[in-house]
Amino acid sequence: MKKLLLFIAGISILFLAGCSNGNQSHGNEGMGDSLPADPPLGYVIELKPLGNFSHQEAEQLREELVKQLGIIFNKVPKAELEASVFVGDKKEIPASCFYKPRNRYWAGGILKMLHEEHGGNDEIVTIGLTHRDISTSIHGQYNYGIMGLSFRPGDACVVSTFRLKRKDDLWKVTIHEFLHSR
């Protein structure tokens, strides 16, 4: 029951975040043809495969996210939602993020890399996708393994499948981290 309430609260926040931008202009000049001039959600979501996460897996996640966002934003045409979520180019995780004693990658280092890639453009939220174990320091515990991390608020998130019991739940963790960024 608690999980259901948290999920409903998260969906509500996503809905409100999408509605709060009104008719503002989003000046995406120079960003390429893949970005809509006025994104229906007020931002564009880029899914970026990292390391051994394949482009095909990222595309499957994109389709699931569009489906779930279509349920949330039922008045937004599917074509507009599809234009707001795209799969970016694959990138390697920097070696500087690797923590050898635990065989994990520091999520904060990955977030910094993703943030710097867009130069702080808040209209694009980049979500890094990996199968590797990621970690952060939390609640006084150094190098704690996590499923995802996000700048709050911000323009970058990272999500890992390493700790997921069911790989088809990746879209839930992705939306969870995305909501932190808004």
Each language-model region and where it sits:
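Sec-dependent N-terminal signal peptides
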Residues: 6-11
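Positively charged n-region of N-terminal signal peptides that target proteins for export
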Residues: 1-4
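Bacterial signal peptide processing site
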Residues: 20-22
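Fold-level signature of zinc-dependent metallopeptidase catalytic domains
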Residues: 41-56
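Metzincin-family zinc-dependent endopeptidase catalytic domain
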Residues: 59, 63-181
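Low-complexity, intrinsically disordered or signal/transmembrane-proximal segments
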Residues: 24-26
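C-terminal motif of bacterial Sec signal peptides marking the signal peptidase cleavage site
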Residues: 16-18
